[in-house]
């Protein structure tokens, strides 16, 4: 998934920077710059997603019948999400507890691993929630806009799709950037330990995506 790809790219870039740096001060400065680039990029992506969502919601949902159909779809989608996330939350708690036990008996590298798995799932679930909300809000608006003109319909459709896309990228970058900062500057981990821990973030996100 995209979360895992972002993680891989950041760690690869980290390794290249370390290899290219001859002095420790330069290495630290490069890492600090990378952290801020990732964080700023995440915020830009999330802000852009918000602006696109507001843009979509400004369009009309069309006739009264279209609005009723859209409301029924949203109601069904909300019921589905509630049932799905309730079930998935129970599974995540079980896996999280198992990982905590494994960390407690020394079978995992560190105590951050269970929490990395958990946050990966939470961010992935949040991205899915946003995607479902914007999709069910855009369907009638897209149909109504397409009735007026093809270009207008495509405009609504692409804007709603951009909300989900940039939300996934923004949340992924944000979580990776925060975890990298915690593991590198607070916990003092080396690159290998960071990679082992942050892989669980990707696993948590992927595990959530299975449902």
Q: Which functions belong to the PLM regions below?
A:
Residues 3, 12-13, 22, 75, ...:
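Alpha-helical structural elements
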Residues 2, 7-9, 15-30:
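Short, Lys/Arg-enriched N-terminal segments with co-localized hydrophobic residues
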């Amino acid at each position: 998934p995209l979360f895992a790809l972002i993680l891989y790219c950041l760690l690869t870039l980290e390794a290249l920077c370390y290899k290219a740096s001859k002095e420790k001060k330069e290495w630290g400065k490069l890492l600090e710059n990378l952290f801020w680039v990732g964080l700023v990029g995440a915020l830009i992506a999330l802000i852009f997603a918000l602006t696109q969502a507001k843009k979509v919601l400004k369009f009309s949902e069309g006739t009264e019948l279209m609005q009723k159909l859209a409301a029924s779809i949203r109601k069904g989608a909300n019921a589905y999400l509630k049932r799905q996330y309730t079930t998935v939350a129970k599974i995540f708690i079980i896996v999280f507890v198992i990982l905590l036990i494994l960390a407690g008996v020394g079978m995992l590298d560190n105590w951050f691993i269970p929490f990395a798995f958990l946050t990966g799932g939470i961010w992935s679930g949040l991205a899915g929630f946003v995607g479902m909300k914007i999709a069910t809000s855009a369907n009638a608006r897209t149909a109504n806009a397409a009735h007026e003109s093809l270009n207008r319909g495509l405009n609504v459709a692409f804007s709603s799709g951009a909300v989900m896309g940039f939300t996934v990228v923004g949340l992924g970058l944000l979580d990776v950037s925060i975890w990298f900062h915690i593991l590198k500057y607070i916990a003092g981990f080396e690159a290998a330990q960071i990679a082992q821990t942050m892989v669980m973030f990707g696993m948590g996100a992927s595990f959530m995506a299975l449902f």
